[in-house]
Each structure stands twice: as C-alpha cells, then as structure tokens.
C-alpha cells in the first residue's frame, strides 16, 4: 500500500489538530459542572456519558495524520484508566496543554530534545511533591467520601465503602445490571466457583434445592472418577468420622456417580460431587487455590499422586460448604494463613507481569476468592441509557476509591497540581530544559482552568486567587465557594493525579519530538459496476 509522509512542522501540526479534536470533546466533561457527551452506537440507543476514556475510545477521524494524534491522546486516557481507573479527562487536558505550549517553543526554534528533558525533570519533581502532601485514607467514612466524590452520589459512596469493608481491598467488587429500579449491594463471603452438584439427589434441602455441608472433608483432584474402587478406601475412612464429603474432580461418572447417589439416598453417607472449575492450566491453578484455602492437597499426576493411594491427610476441610445447581461456596477453609498469604503474594506478582486483560481479570478473581469474597453492586435505573451512564460512574468511583486506599489522597479539583507548582518552579534549569519546566508549570494550571470554565467562571481569576490562598484551600466549582477541600470532601487519589500527569507528559513529549509521520494513502473509490447490456437506464428509477 502506498504511503503518505509529512515532515517537521507539517507533521506536528496535523497531529495536533487530531489532539485538539479529541481533547476538546473530552474536556467539556471535567469537574462537578462538566457537561455530557452523546455517543452514537451502531445498535440501540445512543450512550450519554461524561467518562473521558469511553469518549476517547469512540473517536475516529477521517484524516490519517489527525487520527494518529487523536489516538495518542486516547492512549494517554486508556493508560491512565488501566493504572488508576480514573483521571482520564485530567490526563487528556494535561496532554493538550503540554503539546500546545511545547509546540509554540519548538516552532520558535527551541530544541525538542532539551524541552523533553525539562518536561521529564519537572514531572518527576511534581510527582514527588504530590506524594509528599498525600494524606492516607482509612476508615469506612473516608472511603465512602472518596467514592461519593467520584460517582457524584452519596448512596453509591456508601455501597462501595461497605463492599470494600466486607471483602477487603483485594476482594472482587463487580458491577452488574439489576432487574429492578433500585441499586443494591450483594456480598458472597468465602470462595465461590461456578460449578454445581452433579446430581439433584445430592441436595440436603429439597425445598431450596441446595446441599449444605457442615464441617466437611474435601477431596480435590484433576482426575476423572469413574471407578468407585479408586476412592473406596478413602470413603471408608471418611465414613468413620461421620462427617460429610465434597468431591471436586474433573468429572464423576461411570459406576462411581450412581454408587455415591445411592449411598446418599439411603442415608449411609452425606456426599456431594462437583466438577472442577476452569479449564486447562487455569483449572490446575484454581484447584491449587482451593487446596491451599482448605489445607488439602490436589491429587494429580503432576505430583505423582494416585486416587487409590490418597489418605485423609490429603483432604481439605472447611467450616461450611453450600452447593446449588450452578455454584459452590466454601466458607472458612482450614488452610494455614501463612500458605494463603504466600499464594496471594504469588498471584499479585503474576498480576504485575501479565499483559492480557483477560488474564488480569481471572487473576483478580482468584485473588479475591482467596482474600475473602466477592461483592456485587447491582445497578438499577429507569432507562437503559441511564443505566449505562450509572454503571460507568460506579466503575470510575470504585477504581478511584481503590487508588485512594493504595496511595492516599490530595485536595481535589486540580488544587493539588497548583500546590506543587512552587516546587517545580524552584528547579534550577537552563536553556531548553528550563523551557520544558515552564511548559509543565503552565500545564499544571490547566485542569483548574477547565473546571472553572465548565462551571461558568473565569479560569485565570480562579488560578490567581488559588495561588495566593492558604494551603488546602480551593475553589468548589459546584457551589462557587472557597473551602478547605479535604474537609469538604473534594479530594483526588494521589495515584490518579500522578498517573494522569506522568502519562500526559510522556505522550506529549513524544509528539513534540516527532519529525516525520507516515500514514497509509486512502484507496481510490472503486468504480461503479457497468450496467448490463440492453438495460434501459430509466428502469433504475422505476421504484
């Protein structure tokens, strides 16, 4: 395919047009008085949202050079969302500001490499200054406040706070659509996996159709159990204890399943069999998780173990297990806390190195199940459009809250970025490096300027007053008042603010140091097919 190439100023100018189109669309959503953006969808009703990354991902420009600029800013938003889960609009605003200020200086003859050095030094200083003024977040009320600010709903703040209290910081909190109009919280404590009993005759409660096992033993294997003789010695040992047994296996079939069911019906033995969760290597990992949680051993050929040789020491134990037709929940496994902690640490290290979103999601699920449970926030709304918008807000709030617990909080509304200006300005740099520092100084003002503009105020006036206000005092754009930001509950997680600044500086520097851009030339439109011979042209308009 033929290529179209632009150089130097032409290349940068084309990319900046794309940066502006995307940033101008996204930045109208910033702050408590931010506006909404309506996105056309191929199917169904349009999506109304003020979520920066959702808007950025939808934008595709016709001009290839402009589209590359837009996609780079979209990458800033996506990267910030991946790291911190929020702050995507702030990152977009900062990127546009650094690109614009930088381009003025590059056009005037400044060296882009020197400017990039200055931007990197100033950004690193600003990040350290942000960390220095951070305040830790602890306690249910503080967590609820962070979530309420991000979601713009006190009720959502309460749900997220309660969910995090119930399942811990490592617990999985999922967001689903409710069948009703109300938003509600549901918590499943213990380890749950999506496999139910293999026979309905194994239930202990015929009304609810569930099997409740109190203080059971657990046999865990990745093998298929077809011959009852393979597990008979073990069954006899368990029978002597008069305690129930849960069998988790690749499958239970052949003569084994009817034999177990028959003994259950006769009241000889309380046993429930379920299939192992997951597939392939993920199944092996999940079985190992269950074994560690319950203090058992996975009977597997990988360890040279056979079912017929298994002893009572290989069985896991738990306080209670509930099995229905679709799922199994293990509560209070008997595994050692040290072994569980080591397993959690291993999964966390795998999370840090994985590049697959799917693998990351599955690892987080495993982490949550080991750490204590799963909370589900079921979102209700009067219309489908409102439901989609509410789900996006709650996702942002949940991510922001986790980030706040992890690294602490600073004054919100862009106030913290103004606070660190003094530290950045104190950097002693020369030449183009100093120019890079000054570009960052100007960009740090931009989020406050945009928040004020969206609320109907003059940004420059607000910034001047903010610079001369006591530490911690900021402008509440929702009410038009000057307040103590943290006491009022207007806060931002440090992780969100620093990620937005770091990602913006990184991509903006790349754009400023771009000297050539290569794009695909548009393909010429294919000619219309020739009309069949003898066909009357008038016939084409007959319908």
Curated annotation (Swiss-Prot):
Main location: cytoplasm
Ranges annotated as spanning the membrane: none
Catalysed reactions, semicolon-separated: ATP + H2O + a folded polypeptide = ADP + phosphate + an unfolded polypeptide
Keywords: ATP-binding, Chaperone, Cytoplasm, Isomerase, Nucleotide-binding
HAMAP family reported for this sequence: CH60 (MF_00600)
Family: Belongs to the chaperonin (HSP60) family.
Name this protein carries in UniProt: Chaperonin GroEL
